[in-house]
Structure formats: structure tokens, C-alpha cells
Amino acid sequence: MGRFIFVSFGLLVVFLSLSGTGADCPSGWSSYEGHCYKPFNEPKNWADAERFCKLQPKHSHLVSFQSAEEADFVVKLTRPRLKANLVWMGLSNIWHGCNWQWSDGARLNYKDWQEQSECLAFRGVHTEWLNMDCSSTCSFVCKFKA
């Protein structure tokens, strides 16, 4: 009986130590603030990149940013993994005509760009957001809620 309690307690400690460490994200994905992220070095236009993300676990979307800290995390994640300088993000007004929205439906409460084009990308070396023609090809990051 004592051994059972010891083993059960040990398993509980392991479980609790893994929670919040990315254990909720699939292999190859990185965890931040309850979401999972994965950069893809496969240049695609914006619509194809969003479609590709939807085929990933939990129907992910192109990355959305809710804070400067989250944007910094993603830039640090992409810097060593992506060869491309420009990376798609999920913010566009492609389907909404002058009504910018994140492809994952997240609220637009953090912005860092000048509105000129229908799609946005960020530089993989810092968090500067750039207006891009949606038919251009860029690397991209997919994101889903863990």
C-alpha cells in the first residue's frame, strides 16, 4: 500500500511539473501563454499559408499577436528556424474590405503597421509589420490554442 501511494505521488509530481511547459503542444510545436506555435520554412502566398495551417493540429491559423511580448516570442522562435526574412501573420482585410481581422478570430487589440495592403507580414529579425501583396510568397507561423 505504501508503495502504491509513493508511486501515485510521484506520478502526480511529474504531471504537475509538465503542465505549462509545452506538454499540451504536439512534438515540434512551441508553447507560449496557452498557445502552440510552429514556424514553416515553405514559402506560400497568404491564402495557401492559412489553408496549410488549417490542416495542422486543432485547425490552427496563421499567427496572431495579442501583445508586444507575444510578438517578441514569435520573432525569437522564427529567427533560428526560418531562412526567409518575411513571415506571414494572420492579419488581413482580404475578405472584410477595410475591416482588419485575425484569421483565427482573435480581437485586434495590438497593432504595429500602416494600413496600405490587404495582408501583413513581419520581418523575421524583429517585430516590424509590413504591408504585403497577398500573392507574394513568405514563410509563416501557425498557432492554435492549447
From Swiss-Prot:
Keywords of the record: Disulfide bond, Hemostasis impairing toxin, Metal-binding, Platelet aggregation activating toxin, Secreted, Signal, Toxin
Top-rank taxon: Eukaryota
Annotated signal sequence range: 1-23
Disulfide cross-links: C25-C36, C53-C142, C119-C134
Annotated localization: Secreted
Major localization listed first in the record, in broad terms: secreted
GO cellular component, one term: extracellular region
Domain C-type lectin: 32-143
GO molecular function, one term: toxin activity
Xref: PROSITE patterns: C_TYPE_LECTIN_1 (PS00615), C_TYPE_LECTIN_2 (PS50041)
Coiled coil: none
SUPFAM superfamilies membership: C-type lectin-like
Pfam families hit by this protein: Lectin_C
Tissue specificity remark: Expressed by the venom gland.
Record-stated family: Belongs to the snaclec family.
Function according to Swiss-Prot or TrEMBL: Elicits platelet aggregation by the binding to the C-type lectin domain family 1 member B (CLEC1B/CLEC2). Binding leads to tyrosine phosphorylation in the cytoplasmic tail of CLEC1B, which promotes the binding of spleen tyrosine kinase (Syk), subsequent activation of PLCgamma2, and platelet activation and aggregation. Binding to GPIbalpha (GP1BA) and alpha2/beta-1 (ITGA2/ITGB1) may also induce aggregation, but this is controversial.
Record note on quaternary structure: Dimer (non-covalently linked) of heterodimers of subunits alpha and beta (disulfide-linked).
Protein name, entry field: Snaclec rhodocytin subunit beta
Lineage, highest ranks first: Eukaryota, Metazoa, Chordata, Craniata, Vertebrata
